[in-house]
Design a protein with these regions (language model features):
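Short alpha-beta junction capping motif
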Residues: 38, 89-132
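Extracytoplasmic/secreted proteins, especially bacterial periplasmic and envelope-associated proteins
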Residues: 53-57, 61, 103, 107, ...
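Glycine-rich, histidine-containing beta strand-loop boundary motifs that form or position
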Residues: 12, 121-122, 152
Length: 192
């Protein structure tokens, strides 16, 4: 069973456990038929190839806690590559400047407006850092100044598989600079 992007998102935000009761067959895995592919997006500006552990941690967790047929390999596609438009899940990360070229911008907008899910990871962990500010500026220029909104702790993403009362709590600052900045919320652009 290959999932469309919309089906994957519905499962992610609306009850992954119950929807994936039927386990994968060995032949399906052997043939390379997967329900989930992890796609990392590379972009021309900044440093897209950071935090090598995150993809493997997510992939391992999906294999361990779900019965989805999960491709164990991370796939890397350029944001300018039209094949990224077919991926049900994309990951974009970095520490530095995010400034999409015209093709990257068009693909990002088309992907999101058509229901794509992009997990964006600020590897600086700095609320006021270059990655956060430049990514938010890109989103404002593409989707409008008020497009990025804080997710309430009651959002379905916090109760889709495990139940959380909000984003992961930390007992220490995340950026290591002594300014006590911690992420108390997640942000999203929700295209209806």
């Amino acid at each position: 069973m290959n999932l469309t992007r919309a089906q994957f998102l519905r499962l992610l935000t609306g009850g992954l456990a119950g929807a994936m009761l039927a386990g994968p067959t060995r032949s399906a895995r052997a043939a390379g038929h997967y329900d989930f592919h992890f796609t990392r997006l590379k972009y021309d500006s900044g440093d897209w190839d950071v935090d090598a552990r995150m993809p493997s941690n997510l992939i391992t967790s999906l294999i361990d806690y779900t019965t989805m047929r999960v491709d164990p390999k991370e796939h890397v596609l350029a944001l300018s590559d039209p094949r990224m438009l077919a991926a049900p899940f994309c990951y974009l990360a970095g520490h530095k400047l995010v400034e999409f070229n015209p093709v990257e911008r068009r693909h990002f907008e088309r992907y999101v407006r058509n229901g794509g899910f992009v997990f964006v990871d600020d590897c600086n962990h700095d609320i006021d850092g270059l990655f956060a500010k430049s990514f938010e500026a890109q989103m404002a220029s593409i989707f409008g100044a008020k497009a990025m909104k804080k997710l309430p702790n009651t959002h379905a993403i916090y109760s889709s598989f495990f139940t959380f009362d909000g984003p992961p709590a930390t007992s220490f600052e995340l950026n290591g600079w002594g300014d006590d900045l911690v992420h108390e919320y997640l942000q999203a652009i929700d295209i209806k």
